[in-house]
């Protein structure tokens, strides 16, 4: 890989040191076909690629997505959702950014990506990968339009590299670009009796008719997992965009449903009955044929409903989102105006009880859902990837405890997620016998535990209290999640947390002499409640310095974070802490820059407990401990206790 040549700008333009124009931004392990272009890829800014670059086109068709050498059709299909909604587009790409013709242009580009409950603002430079002077990854229909390749670069930065985008789920990218929900509808069922096949056929027919109503409001994508004989041109593990649906009458008066499919590869790959010049068009009026064929853009083709159900395996559809930010039901078109969200974690040996087949199921995280009026309710469990998380700057980082995990973009989809499920019970009141309730059949539940980033339930719920229990399939499978609720009526959501009197006593210090220091502090909304490292406000958390004295070797240190609660208070905040080492010569280093580095040690995931503790060996030096709640603006008081073992040298008389 080498730097591209072009006109030298009159002023110094921004260069993103966190995502440089280098192999580290292109590749993660050179396991994909991209590796063969390693020596040929150059980096160029848009004004070095064409004479008059634009961010957006005047004609929307000129901004149509096209795939390059990168296997990220799943992401590009989701990007097409932004073309359907000005509101969503401006949510992801903030308007008013200086572009190439502006005096204020600095060579930077900012996007917002929704990550685990929050919109994360990510900035990078506008140097883009090229081959022979042309964009080698995504591009728009008109190559002087750059919103798509710039957004792709931001998304690659969030994931760690372009190669990390090789293979994924359209549904995941839709959620990242909208903050909403997405559903996957399988078009294939397990073959059974004739009756089952008939029911499946009627369900598929209803699905396609449903798409007619949703086509103008929702992004609809379809995928081929393994092409049938005679349709190899569709490719394997490839995603397409359903850009239009039309219901026609044939010459006999029978209904025909046609779907217009866009291939992100930018080429027409369909040889079915309704291809251009195909015999299917003889069934409809010539004027209709001329109209529909004239609408085709590069890479688009028409498919009849029966062909579609036979050749495609899956549909992914994003929930419509209004300009006010409310989701709309795919099934009833009602607005889901009421939303709630809470984080949680499955902790090995504590709250990772496994599925309902395991005796430990009652130990899983549990949540109260109160429904105030008859409502259509969606409850979703969103997992955090076990391999990557996004830090304050929008950069991908390895999760604590996973730094030695290997991953290849060619891995099985879902390999870096747990198999998760969700079950819901209705109860008469909040004070119930939980083991007894959990032994009864739930009122709703996922059909199975799935290796998906997010699973959700759709329920019609009457007023009352409900108990929601997200779980992993395997016991002691660790992970973090976000429980989200969307409802047409008023709802409240709260976590069932450990009772203080049942909290585990503080572990005794190992034998020996210990020096102990106690530090008191508090988290205050808008001031010192910065939340976890996933949020840009993390550096505002309280930060306490401490030191380990010189000695023959590392010292044993126990750090304990205790949140102050009333004796009857059962609602703990999820808490944790990180330890940062101050570099030699950095005695006066300010806390914020230090906290943007990787911590030396961590006590995470954040736990719903009154107290968390970590015993560690630390070499002599200066350190800072930063206690935090999981979410920003969560208020509370706490005490940090630092106990350092004192090594006494023997005295000689």
UniProtKB/Swiss-Prot annotation:
**What's any GO biological process attached to this entry?**
proteolysis
Give the EC number: 3.4.22.-
Ranges for region Domain III 2: 513-653
InterPro entries, per this entry?
A: C2_III, Calpain_cysteine_protease, Calpain_domain_III, Calpain_III, Calpain_III_sf, Papain-like_cys_pep_sf, Pept_cys_AS, Peptidase_C2_calpain_cat
Keyword Cell wall biogenesis/degradation (UniProt): no
Quick one: a GO cellular component term? cytoplasm
Q: Where is the active site?
A: 73, 238, 263
Enzyme class (EC, first level): hydrolase
Known role? Calcium-regulated non-lysosomal thiol-protease which catalyzes limited proteolysis of substrates involved in cytoskeletal remodeling and signal transduction. May play a role in insulin-stimulated glucose uptake.
Question: What is the designated name of this protein?
Answer: Calpain-10
Task: Give the organism's phylogenetic lineage.
Answer: Eukaryota, Metazoa, Chordata, Craniata, Vertebrata
* Gene name tied to this protein: CAPN10
